[in-house]
Amino acid sequence: MTMTVRQKLEHQPISDSAVTEHHYTPYLRDYDVFVEVPAALPNGKGSYIESRYRYRFTHCVTAEVTTAVSADIWRKSWDNVLIDYETWQNAGEPNGYVWGVGYSDAYPGLRYIEGSKVAQDWSRRLEKEMHEIMIETNGHNIRLVFHDVEIQKVAQGDPETRELKPLVDENNMGRS
């Protein structure tokens, strides 16, 4: 039995994970969202990245990214010292949003927009079923209108070394 787009997304770990990157693929049709999923270490003392996933939203007609950071925090976070984590630490950890952490917390995470008027309009225009989602993080909100989603585990974490081992050729991920 084939899963619907909504079912595929409901069974995946986007919420309470880290969005590490998102962008259109090199061929500009599809939109990729990379997510790292944390897990507790087996001894319960600390955590590691259990896995990394690529969510490829195919035939993406809308990709809208807006800030989730308030204007007040933006004003406090203007300095370039905040775009590099080590530079921020060396500067005495000044107040502001530390852009340099390199990820956004996916909370509340992904929400499927049931009955989306925008997706319905695109479905009618393209004569293909389209869907709309919103991914909310502490840094950005990502709204996508797309046809399907392909979910691939691209790296597996090791709790002993806390390193991620690639499962696919990362140089070819834009085309696979």
Regions found by a protein language model. Give the residues of each.
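Surface-exposed, interaction-prone regions used to assemble/regulate multi-protein complexes
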Residues: 1-176
